């Protein structure tokens, strides 16, 4: 409503569809693997090294997409900026997964909350003042970058026992262990979003804005399911590896 229906459709596609798809590519499906790696088969440096590679590739794919898409300059810029926003989110996810793996889930929640509040406030404030989606997107990316630096990058450096080194060949081994997870999350999200891609190609931007509002409850259900299950994964991994099967089964029953 602040920028009009057409801008709403552009943002819906840029943020919840293509941008989120690039998040999934950069994310690589590693989060569940990392937070359950309580035996530290891989170091934080291994996870971060692979995530930097996947984030870089996601940026390149996003840039290539907007080059060949035939969009106007403003739409292409908004789509690419939302790709950058989501890729920064994927990079921050590596740090937040390490917080959880080290038993500091509260830091994960704080980081996610503070980054989201900062970026959403800057985005909506800019949009309300200027009415320009492109300007608001620039502010959102800037706020996301600052939030990542303050609430992830600086925080993890204060934690003990975080191993930044990565042994030769470990990133490739980690890639091999997670490549099927990568395909599963990318293909799953494509199936989830195929209707939005079809509308974006064959209908007007304002139609996608309306469809996005109708589609939103499905996204919320999926998001809430993640909030409920994900915090328990590290505890489940610890109970399984230490042989505390009674506690393991109790958590499973509570979740069920």
What is the meaning of each model-derived region?
Residues 1-23, 76, 133-134, 138, ...:
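Interfacial/gating helices of multi-pass transporter permease domains
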Residues 106, 110-111, 134-140, 149-193, ...:
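Interhelical loop/hinge segments that connect adjacent transmembrane helices in multipass membrane
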Residues 30-42, 87-113, 134, 241:
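Membrane-interface junctions at transmembrane-helix termini in multi-pass inner-membrane proteins
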Residues 13-16, 20-25, 52, 56, ...:
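Alpha-helical transmembrane segments of multi-pass membrane proteins
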Residues 23-42, 101, 214, 219-243, ...:
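Helix-loop junctions and terminal segments of transmembrane helices
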Residues 16, 51, 79-82, 86, ...:
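Residue-level signature of transmembrane alpha-helical cores of multipass secondary-active transporters
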Residues 76-83, 109-159, 177, 215-218:
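Hydrophobic alpha-helical transmembrane segments
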Residues 13, 39-53, 175, 212, ...:
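Interfacial transmembrane-helix starts/ends
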